[in-house]
Amino acid sequence: MSKGQAQQQSAFKQLFTEFFNLGGDFSKVSKDLKKPLKTYVKESYPHFLVTDGYFFVQPHFTKEAVAEFHQKFPNVNIVDLHDKVIVINSWSLELRRVNSAEVFTSYANLEARLVVHSFKPNLQERLNPTRYPVNLFRDDEFKTIIQHFRHQALQQSIAKNTKQESLPDISKLSGADAAGKKTKVDGGIVKTGASKGDEFADFSFKEGSTAVLKIQDIFVQEKGKDALKRIQDQQVESVQVQPKVRGGAKGKKKAATKSATKKTVAAKKTAESADVRKSVDKIVKYTPNKPSSRKETPQKSQSAPAAGKSSAKRTTTGSKTKIPANPSPSGKKSTKTTDQMTMAQFKKYLDWHEKKKGGKTSSGGKVLGKRSAGKASATSGKASKASKRSKK
C-alpha cells in the first residue's frame, strides 16, 4: 500500500479537504461523505477529541444533542467516554474565523468545526488504534489546502474591490520624484477589502453561527460545580509544583556570610602553609649534604651503617671498614647516569684513598704505600738486574 493510499483512508482528512476545496460550503459536499461517523474517543476532558485512527478533531455538541444523549443514556456521562466508541449520526461542518494562538484545532486563524447534532455511545465495541493519531490541522498537506483557500480568497477580494479608475498613476508619481517634488509614501499602495492590521479578513464564505456547549458546561451538568473546581485546583497545583531532579550536577549551595567566607579562606591558607612546611622538611631530610668545594674531602660518616650492610673490604684485623657518607671528589657531573673522571681527578682520588689508609703518595701521584712481607721492592729489583749485566 502506497503512502497516498494510506492517507486516503483517513475519513476526516478526505472530508475536511473537500470542504475547503468547495469554498467552505457544506451544502456542496458530496452526499456519500455525509454518512454517520464511527469514531474513537481519544480524550473526553478537558478537551473532547475523536479520531478516525489517523487524525483527531474536536467535535462541538449542540444543546439539543447533549439533552438527547442524557435522556437516552442517563447512566453514561459524556465526560467519561474516554477510550470508548461513539457513533455521530447527525453532524455538519462550519467554517469560522478564530485565533489560532488560542484554538489548537485551527490553522491560519481558520477552523473547520465539526458540529454534532445527534450521537450515541457504542459501549460494546472496542477499538485498538494501530497508530497514535495526530492533529489534523498540523498535517502539512492539509495546511497547504488551507493556504490555497486563503490565496483564492485574496485573489477574489482584489478582483472585486480593485477598479482601474481607483489605481494610482505610477507615471505621475515617478515624474514628481524626477522633478524633486515631495510625494506621500503610501501614494502607490492599493488597499482592497477589510483587514485587521496585517491580517487578511475579507473572506467571501458564510461563517457558521451554530450555538454549541463548552465541555466545561457539560461537565458541570453531569458532575456539578464542586467537582469541576476540584479538578481545576488539581490542574493549577500540578502546574505550580516544581519537579524534583535527581542525579546530575549538584545544585549550588547558598551564599555564605562574609565572616564565614573569611574564616574559610583563612583556614584554607593555614592548611596550605602547613602542607608546604611538611614538604620542605621531607626534602631537607632526604637530601644528602653537598660539599662546598670540589677539592674538599668528604666528611667521615657520623652514623653507623645500616643493619646487614657493610663494605666488602676487610682490614688486616678482620674488621670491616666504613664507606664514606659522601661521594669522592670529582668534576662536574655529566648528563649520563655515571660520573666521568679525568686523569687529574683520578690521581686526586688515589691520593685521598691512600691518605685514608695511612699510606704515602709521591709527587708524581704514584702510590708508595705499605708492602707485604716477602715481596722485593722496585729499587732492589732494578739493582739485581744491574748486577747480572755486570757479571756477564
From Swiss-Prot:
Keyword terms of this UniProt record: Chromosome, DNA-binding, Nucleus, Telomere
GO cellular component, one term: nucleus
Chain intervals with Basic residues compositional bias: 247-256
SUPFAM superfamilies: Nucleic acid-binding proteins
Residue ranges with Low complexity bias: 257-268, 374-384
Compositional bias segments (type: Polar residues): 328-343
Stretches with biased composition (Basic and acidic residues): 269-284
Pfam families: TEBP_beta
GO MF annotations, alphabetized: telomeric DNA binding
Cell compartments where the protein resides: Nucleus; Chromosome, Telomere
Range of residues in the leader sequence: none
Disordered: annotated segments: 234-392
Subunit structure: Heterodimer of an alpha and a beta subunit.
Function, in words: May function as protective capping of the single-stranded telomeric overhang. May also participate in telomere length regulation during DNA replication.
Protein name: Telomere-binding protein subunit beta
Organism: Stylonychia mytilus
Upper lineage: Eukaryota, Sar, Alveolata, Ciliophora, Intramacronucleata
Gene: STY43
